[in-house]
Amino acid sequence: MSEQRSPMSGDSHPLRRSTDRASLPGTRTVSLVLTVRPGDGRPGAALDRLLGQVPASVREVVLIGGPAEAGAARDGLRVVRLGDWDSTRGDIPHAALLAATGDLIVLMNADGSMSPHEIPHYLHYLESGYDFVKGSRFIAGGDYADYPLSRRVGHHALLRIARRLYGQHLTDLWYGFCAFRRPFVDLLDLRGDGVELGAELVTHALHYGLRVAEVPSLELPRRHDPSHPRTIRDGARILGALLHERPHNALSRLAHGPFRGPSG
């Protein structure tokens, strides 16, 4: 696990301070937001399997874009369906996050590439005082099922840019498996609903000075319709997200000297 803190103290909005009274483990309510994106084919069986794996600590699932015929969830699990994903709009994920009522919110894809069995690990770090916890496929204990060389090279380049813009050393920039406290949603102004969503969430967290932790995550093979990454287009969208949230002094830092820092 790695910890990151934003250097932008002037814009800090910490959601939890060291003087706050910590709640007992398990006393906060937890919502899981599941996204089924356009083009994900027929996710019904994979979604039913995923709902059956949701841990007991999660009491609410907000499902966006899922089929109406998705199977019943376990007893005690409330499922809220927001209907079809309109790809012409850029605020779909934000609407789903706003619909979640839990004190802690977990966001993950419903394509089978992310496992609900990892959710307690994310919640542990939130309960321990972190504001934003994100998964990483590139730290000890994490791994990925399919990551072409061109995509790894692009990710490495974007990490170096992010380190110069934000002064941090994250290892996985756009992986969308993350968890955070409910007040973070009120700080968001999400613009994208594609691959750059993960990067937008991370940059918002850094911008507001939240205490960020990375935890290892295992990316599994998608259970329906394998992904078709478009490296150049996706990279351009993520770069746009990084630049949009950059601190005011970031471009001057970017212009001074070669990139430095450990490989990502």
Question: Whereabouts are the PLM-identified features?
Answer:
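Acceptor/aglycone-binding surface of glycosyltransferases and processive sugar-polymer synthases
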Residues: 85-99, 116-195, 222-229, 239
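Acidic donor-binding segment of Leloir-type glycosyltransferases
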Residues: 50-81
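Acidic metal-phosphate-binding loop of nucleotide-sugar-dependent transferases
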Residues: 112-114
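Active-site acidic Asp-centered loop
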Residues: 66, 108-110
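Hydrophobic helical membrane-anchoring modules
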Residues: 1-52, 65-66, 167, 190-264
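Short aromatic/hydrophobic "clamp" motif used to bind/position activated sugar donors
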Residues: 105
